[in-house]
Structure formats: C-alpha cells, structure tokens
UniProtKB/Swiss-Prot annotation:
Its EC number is 3.1.1.81. One of its GO terms (molecular function) is acyl-L-homoserine-lactone lactonohydrolase activity. It comes from the Bacteria. InterPro entries: MBL_superfamily_lactonases, Metallo-B-lactamas, RibonucZ/Hydroxyglut_hydro. Coiled coil: none annotated. This is N-acyl homoserine lactonase. It is an enzyme of class 3 (hydrolase). Keywords: Hydrolase, Metal-binding, Zinc. Zn(2+) 1 binds at H117, H119, H188, D210. It comes from Arthrobacter sp. The gene is ahlD. Hydrolyzes the acyl homoserine lactones N-hexanoyl-L-homoserine lactone, N-3-oxohexanoyl-L-homoserine lactone, N-octonoyl-L-homoserine lactone, N-decanoyl-L-homoserine lactone and N-3-oxododecanoyl-L-homoserine lactone.
Amino acid sequence: MEKDQLKVRVLETGVMEADMAWLLLKPGRIIADRNNKERQREWGEIPTHAVLIEHPEGRILWDTGVPRDWSSRWQESGMDNYFPVKTESSSESGFLDSSLAQVGLEPADIDLLILSHLHLDHAGNARLFDNGKTKIVANRKELEGVQEIMGSHLGGHLKADFEGLKIDAIEGDTEIVPGVSVIDTPGHTWGTMSLQVDLPDDGTKIFTSDAVYLRDSFGPPAIGAAVVWNNLLWLESVEKLRRIQERTNAEMIFGHESEQTSQIRWAHQGHYQ
C-alpha cells in the first residue's frame, strides 16, 4: 500500500466537564456534580474525539463523541449533571457532524463505523449512521453485555443510543484492513476496544478510548478510575497496551486527556499518514 493511501484525521466531538475523580481515583475524594464543582479542586475538561481513517478499502470512523442534544438525552440518567458538555460545544463547531463537514463529509460517506464501546460519549451519535450505507460494528462482549441492562440506562450506557441499531459483532484482536486493527481491551466495560493504526510516515498510533482515560492512568503504575466495570480486566488491558506500545514504539492517544489536545494534529490542522 502506498503511504499516501492511508490517512488518519482526528475529529473534535465535544468537550465534557466533570470531577476528575471519575477518571483518576485519589484517596479521600468524593465525586461532585456540576452544582457542587466549586467545592472540588479538580473539576476539569474531558475532551472527546473520533478518528477518521481514509483507506483504499474505504472510509472508517472510530467512535462518535457526544450528541448535540446531550442535555435532554442524558437527563433521565443524571449524567447531564455529572458530565455536562461545555457551552462552547453547543455551537456549530465541536460536534461530530460539523467536524465531518469540515473535511467535506457527511455520515453516509462512512463505510464502516467502529464503536470502541457503547457509552454515551462514544456511541452518542451512532444513530447518524443508521443510513443503509454504513456498517456498524462493536465488540461481541459489549453487545452481549448491554442485553443485561434493565430499564433505560446503566451507568454510562443509554439504551436509546444503540437499541434497535444493526450492529455487527467482532471479537478479539482483529485486523480491520491492512494497517488498521482493533485491540481487545475489556475492563472499562464488557467489550471496550482500542484502535491501532500503523502509518508509514508518522508511525504507530494507539487510540486507547476508555481503556486508558489519561496519561496518569497509564502510569506506570496504572491508576484506576471510578467508572470501571471490572478492575482486574482493566489492569490486564492497560498492561497489554503497554506491551504493544513498547514493542511498536507507538504514540498513545488517550481517551480523555485534556493536556494532550494541544499535541494532537486535529483534522482542521491536517492529517497523519
């Protein structure tokens, strides 16, 4: 494959705010909501992103970010109080549809949508791709896990985001197309996956999704978070990613690291290849 045939663009998909204890546990801390954020020392920004891959075999999108109507959609679960989206992201910029438009695309132009997992800030725009053209996939364990949800939501899973969508299952560490693979990294949820892209010029990139929230989460040592379904599996997944990173010298792009946003080459700035 010629090096100019594989391009990766990182798309802005909304910035949430929250008590950072959700993402990095520290002794003696409680978790605040937005009505009490002034009492906390670490109320911060939680950026989200999607990854657009231009490949000879088609256009691939990794994750979808937060929806424009987050306030109403998240209200029943209470997540609107704990993870409010920044006001600036309620404008025309900063959401998936506008980020796609910046590069001249719309949802129907995507051939394959890969959902790292089905939480509200990753699958929140999945219905944009219910268009008869885009194939949607997620990990089999994730698809089986959400079948256990009683009621409309469980933690960060909102059934309204994905219920009724045709989502095909993939399993384990899987090469999607040459140079693009998903890594099975459960723990955060039943079937959380990470994305590995091997680029001729810019090297290997690993997009961890929520398998690793932050640089401090990665360590070493790895530091846990409040939103983890299975702590042992989570730790095993972090160490699995560390082994891959050491073997490939990959750049790690973490799921919600605000300090990394200035280092990422966003789609409006260019692409990786």
